[in-house]
Regions:
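Basic/aromatic-rich interaction segments and small domains that mediate binding to polyanionic partners
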Residues: 10-40, 80, 119-128, 141-166
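N-terminal intrinsically disordered, low-complexity, charge/repeat-rich segments that act as generic
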Residues: 1-100
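Mixed-charge, Lys/Arg-rich low-complexity intrinsically disordered regions
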Residues: 92-145, 152
């Protein structure tokens, strides 16, 4: 998707200030947002690319002015409403007014502990390329999420490593 989120190589945003001894979360609610995101993804409400796409659809001014976890929260709210897990009114009120829609799969503590160690996925099909292969990326403009940033489209490169497929 071509939108404001794809800022790789863009000038004019100034120096990135690194916070010394930066905590993982600046506020407790950020940790809860991460936990909800992980539970919803494990529960198959959505996947990581769908989560990113929801954030990429935020209005540019919102995307640029929100913090990292604010974008996650806004994207989750959109996805929760679109998928029928809650209504906008319920989110605003902070509680359900009708019985909720169940997730396809429930996250348990043991399942979380097993999954949190790695995001590695077994390769589902033979790799199309191998390290050392010369490749050219496509110059695409998809309407949904892509992992190919604008600055890398239509460019020549060499495969350095394969990390599986999914």
């Amino acid at each position: 998707m071509d939108s404001v989120h794809d800022m790789g190589g863009v000038d004019g945003f100034g120096k990135v200030e690194v916070e010394k001894n930066e905590p993982v979360f600046h506020a407790a609610w950020e940790g809860r947002v991460l936990a909800i995101q992980r539970a919803m993804a494990y529960g198959r409400a959505w996947n990581i690319d769908q989560s990113r796409f929801a954030q990429e659809q935020l209005p540019p001014i919102t995307y640029l002015s929100a913090t990292y976890y604010q974008r996650w929260l806004l994207g989750m709210e959109k996805s929760i409403i679109e998928r029928g897990f809650a209504t906008a009114e319920e989110l605003k009120a902070g509680h359900a007014t009708t019985p909720g829609k169940m997730l396809p799969r429930k996250l348990t503590v043991s399942a979380f502990q097993q999954r949190r160690r790695s995001f590695f996925r077994q390769q589902q099909a033979p790799a199309l390329f191998k390290p050392g292969d010369r490749v050219r990326t496509r110059n695409i403009h998809p309407k949904t999420h892509t992992r190919l940033p604008g600055y890398a489209r239509g460019k020549l490169g060499v495969v350095e490593r394969c990390q599986g497929s999914g």
